[in-house]
């Protein structure tokens, strides 16, 4: 077929080169043909579509956009089932969620999108990323092995060796849950073997470890951190000119930290601990 529009039910196909079998409802399309279904648009160098089974496949330079739920999938292979609303992408796969004020970008070996219906009038989407995951927003960036983002509660969960960056702060744990609001990150929960690291210079790092950590954000910056259970703190107090005074090592059960302009403003330990302050030239390497 030449330049053609094929319309059936809720579907629309535009193609300038391809074949469409009207008897079995199957199409094989080339030259950046486009399949549209209820606000979703699938295009690639080549397409296969089965109207009876309700699915389409796209190959090479694939873009799938969902204008209703405001997300996008790209890659060199994409599958979409219009009956279950399930989408799958691989080979240089990237997902973009632009349903909130700040877009969330996710890259992984494999990306999947699921649609769940709470009732006849309500639904939410879930994006799952597997292996070599990287995610980016203007306020936070992260890497991990697996990731799940749910539009139901705007929660992004990172699994297996997750690392999260916010400005000069680095957060690590066995699992990290990040809760978004419309325009920025709201708070994060770092579970099991939680660690926060802030680099001050080439050899000095503020470090906090604990069983778990809860971090609250405002305006895209970390403002308050609660560290709970088996807390160990390595902290470098500063002079007014930012000269490091020494290295303080403390241990406690609960630590509340308050930050302003990306710097420590106040710290509360329960029970209180004065710790040990080492001069800069006498820092024991095993405690750094």
Question: Could you say what each language-model-derived stretch is?
Answer:
Residues 1-288:
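Structural signature for solvent-exposed beta-strand/loop edge elements and short helix-capping sites
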């Amino acid at each position: 077929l030449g330049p053609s529009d094929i319309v059936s039910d809720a579907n629309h196909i535009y193609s300038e080169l391809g074949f469409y079998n009207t008897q079995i409802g199957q199409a094989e399309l080339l030259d950046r043909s486009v399949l549209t279904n209820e606000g979703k648009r699938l295009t690639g160098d080549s397409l296969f579509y089965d109207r009876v089974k309700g699915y389409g496949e796209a190959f090479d330079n694939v873009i799938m956009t969902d204008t209703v739920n405001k997300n996008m999938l790209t890659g060199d292979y994409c599958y979409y089932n219009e009956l279950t609303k399930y989408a799958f992408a691989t080979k240089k796969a990237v997902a973009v969620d632009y349903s909130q004020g700040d877009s969330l970008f996710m890259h992984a070996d494999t990306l999947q999108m699921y649609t769940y219906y709470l009732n006849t009038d309500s639904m939410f989407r879930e994006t799952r990323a597997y292996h070599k995951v990287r995610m980016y927003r203007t306020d936070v960036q992260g890497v991990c092995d697996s990731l799940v983002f749910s539009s139901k509660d705007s929660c992004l969960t990172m699994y297996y060796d997750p690392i999260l960056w916010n400005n000069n702060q680095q957060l690590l744990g066995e699992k990290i849950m990040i809760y978004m609001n419309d325009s920025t990150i709201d708070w994060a929960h770092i579970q099991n073997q939680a660690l926060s690291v802030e680099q001050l210079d080439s050899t000095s790092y503020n470090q906090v470890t604990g069983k778990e950590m809860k971090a609250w954000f405002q305006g895209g910056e970390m403002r308050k951190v609660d560290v709970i259970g088996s807390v160990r703190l390595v902290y470098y107090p500063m002079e007014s000119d930012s000269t490091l005074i020494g290295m303080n090592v403390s241990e406690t059960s609960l630590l509340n930290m308050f930050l302003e302009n990306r710097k420590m403003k106040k710290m509360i330990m329960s029970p209180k601990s004065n710790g040990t302050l080492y001069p800069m030239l006498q820092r024991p390497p095993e405690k750094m």
